[in-house]
Curated annotation (Swiss-Prot):
The gene is y05D. It comes from the Viruses. This is Uncharacterized 20.7 kDa protein in nrdC-mobD intergenic region.
Amino acid sequence: MNAKDIFNLVNYNDGKFKSEAQSKFFNDISIGGEITVNGGQIYKSRWNWIVIIDEIGIVEIYKNTNKNRTLHWSRDTNEQYKKDKASKLSRVTQEDIEFIKKDILMYDNLIAEEQAVIDKFDEIKASREIPDFMKESVNERYTLISERIETYKKQRAERQNTLRKFEERLNTVLA
């Protein structure tokens, strides 16, 4: 049992168990309706999650640190938790969208720079000014740059796809 399992129930099922089998499993591993799940550690500061359950699902989640125990989530505060999470998603998503747009612009610039080199190679090849001993080297360089352009185009396409998904998610959150 880990924190991800607990928070998946909270985030995707409002803390309710998905089946009787899951309810039985959680109740079997609980001690007096309480489950302790490892949270993590930063330097010497450790924390864990105290999960209070009943037959229906998770009732409350507390963050337990060396100093105190604070309520992180409960059925009563679930609506506020969802609103807070949605606002965080929209903020992060907006920043991510700007970052991805910068990435796409960077790939456009890289492609343009490499394409300028390819165009220059084409110009030199057309004028037949390449000495015989350099033709192989020029052809290798031409192939290398062409492959690099294709890689940049693939990476740009991936970022554009991610941008589209993020914009859709942002529109969904803001709607």
